[in-house]
């Protein structure tokens, strides 16, 4: 079973890394792939350029074990990064191996705004990183999907290639890339929020400076 963890990673930080580790361990994934996005269709463009964001990810994962990998196909493809196209490409390579698209709760609640969002369920399971004790309000279309597809036992994800929704509580570190960029613009320290080697690269190349 393979996990797909997409994002701009602008910059990558310990919130991303800790969540990825817990997902990989809890779901017993063979591999978890970090998938840096070239251009998110529904958000402003990233601040750092694609190759710099990729370098930061490479540095952050340099000491990781074999369970993490980088998938650069969205950067290589260029243009808006539609997840349905990305998963279609991955599915052609992986055959019937179960795929898990890993998303945060906010992204999941916005799923009906994604390009061809219903098609995602024929390509992968969706694993939602849930906040403890959080009341969820769904759009009607998404509510029906959850009612039809939610499973509560993660072993069910391994039983078929795609189509299920699983909510996973992970350690929620109150770290956001937006906040880190703001701190750096204001000249404040971002130490202990992201790997030191990533922070060194940011300072060396004056990323996110005024």
Swiss-Prot record:
One of its GO terms (molecular function) is ATP binding. It holds the Pfam family CTP_transf_like. Its EC number is 2.7.7.18. Pathway: Cofactor biosynthesis; NAD(+) biosynthesis; deamido-NAD(+) from nicotinate D-ribonucleotide: step 1/1. It comes from the Bacteria. The keyword Transferase applies. It catalyses: nicotinate beta-D-ribonucleotide + ATP + H(+) = deamido-NAD(+) + diphosphate. One of its GO terms (biological process) is NAD biosynthetic process. Keywords: ATP-binding, NAD, Nucleotide-binding, Nucleotidyltransferase, Pyridine nucleotide biosynthesis, Transferase. Belongs to the NadD family. Catalyzes the reversible adenylation of nicotinate mononucleotide (NaMN) to nicotinic acid adenine dinucleotide (NaAD). This is Probable nicotinate-nucleotide adenylyltransferase.
